[in-house]
């Protein structure tokens, strides 16, 4: 998932805050403290940043693909 560019509810631009938000959380701050430091005070914007997860780090652990048994391949000739 791409980081949010705008708040899903009010439309406030948030994309420029995403890298700093991740840095602050990685440095040990809670997401709430990081959002306070960034000046994100609307609860809709806080929710948009807080619940946005980049799933690529999790998905990269798994093998992606579809296994089709050989007998099924014969059906498609």
Curated annotation (Swiss-Prot):
Domain of life: Archaea
GO molecular function terms attached to this record: DNA binding; DNA-directed RNA polymerase activity; zinc ion binding
Enzyme Commission code(s) on record: 2.7.7.6
Reaction(s) catalysed (UniProt annotation): RNA(n) + a ribonucleoside 5'-triphosphate = RNA(n+1) + diphosphate
GO CC terms in record: cytoplasm; DNA-directed RNA polymerase complex
Record flagged with keyword NAD: no
A Pfam family per the record: RNA_pol_N
UniProt remark on cofactor binding: Binds 1 zinc ion.
Cofactor(s) annotated in UniProt: Zn(2+)
Location in or out of the cell: Cytoplasm
Binding sites annotated in the UniProt record for Zn(2+): 7, 10, 44-45
Keyword entries, A-Z: Cytoplasm, DNA-directed RNA polymerase, Metal-binding, Nucleotidyltransferase, Transcription, Transferase, Zinc
Chain segments annotated as coiled-coil in the UniProt record: none
Gene3D superfamilies assigned to the protein according to its UniProt record, in alphabetical order: Homeodomain-like
InterPro entries the UniProt entry points to: RNA_pol_su_RPB10 (IPR023580), RNA_pol_suN_Zn-BS (IPR020789), RPABC5/Rpb10 (IPR000268)
Chief place of localization: cytoplasm
GO biological process: DNA-templated transcription
Group of enzyme by EC: transferase
PANTHER family attached to this UniProt entry: DNA-DIRECTED RNA POLYMERASES I, II, AND III SUBUNIT RPABC5, DNA-DIRECTED RNA POLYMERASES I, II, AND III SUBUNIT RPABC5 FAMILY MEMBER
Family: Belongs to the archaeal Rpo10/eukaryotic RPB10 RNA polymerase subunit family.
Function: DNA-dependent RNA polymerase (RNAP) catalyzes the transcription of DNA into RNA using the four ribonucleoside triphosphates as substrates.
Subunit structure of this chain's protein: Part of the RNA polymerase complex.
Descriptive protein name: DNA-directed RNA polymerase subunit Rpo10
Organism from which the protein derives: Aeropyrum pernix (strain ATCC 700893 / DSM 11879 / JCM 9820 / NBRC 100138 / K1)
UniProt lineage: Archaea, Thermoproteota, Thermoprotei, Desulfurococcales, Desulfurococcaceae
């Amino acid at each position: 998932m791409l980081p949010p560019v705008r708040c899903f509810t009010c439309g406030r631009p948030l994309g420029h805050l995403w890298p700093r938000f991740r840095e602050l959380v990685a440095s040990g701050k809670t997401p709430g403290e990081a959002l306070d430091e960034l000046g994100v005070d609307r609860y809709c914007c806080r929710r948009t940043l807080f619940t946005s997860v980049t799933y690529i780090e999790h998905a990269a652990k798994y093998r992606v693909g579809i296994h089709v048994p050989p007998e099924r391949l014969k059906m498609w000739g």
